[in-house]
């Protein structure tokens, strides 16, 4: 579907320079002299490179519609992650580097959304929050009120986050998977 350059919004996926790009940030600019344009920060969906582009209102770009399917995480097999389509029960195998650092958050039966373009997976979205147990937490230093009131802790999947001082080892906490931050106790 063709759209004008000034209609690009954050989250839109467009075809540009032979690749698929997602708009991360957009800024409509109206200079005193010359025509208005849309300054867009793009991120390549395949290799993650970033690009800043200007699109005039008169330019048209191809907006791509991605198919989004729900999959359930089954298991890990070496460097491969195995998912199952919840509608057709077909299995999908993705490499760990496709998911990136967030692969550590995958748990058996976890529902994820896989973005497909022409039946080929190009992106994956994990739940925004997961519940995990704390395996290690530093003891609280009494009277340390001038500094930040957070202490380092290690989750059951090996990821280090900062937690409030009242969180102890063995407790379950809710973690933001995008920012890798503590949200609350479970």
Curated annotation (Swiss-Prot):
The entry's keywords: Cytoplasm, Elongation factor, Protein biosynthesis
Listed InterPro entries: Elong-fact-P_C, NA-bd_OB-fold, Rib_uL2_dom2, Transl_elong_fac_P/YeiP, Transl_elong_KOW-like, Transl_elong_P/YeiP_cen, Transl_elong_P/YeiP_CS, Transl_elongation_fac_P
Entry's Gene Ontology BP terms: peptide biosynthetic process
Source species, domain of life: Bacteria
Recorded GO CC terms: cytoplasm
Gene Ontology MF term list: translation elongation factor activity
Metabolic or biological pathway, per its Swiss-Prot or TrEMBL entry: Protein biosynthesis; polypeptide chain elongation
Pfam (any one): EFP
UniProt cross-references to SMART domains, sorted A to Z: EFP, Elong-fact-P_C
Cellular location(s): Cytoplasm
Protein family: Belongs to the elongation factor P family.
NCBIfam families associated with the record: efp (TIGR00038), PRK00529.1 (NF001810)
The protein's role, per its UniProt record: Involved in peptide bond synthesis. Stimulates efficient translation and peptide-bond synthesis on native or reconstituted 70S ribosomes in vitro. Probably functions indirectly by altering the affinity of the ribosome for aminoacyl-tRNA, thus increasing their reactivity as acceptors for peptidyl transferase.
Protein name as annotated: Elongation factor P
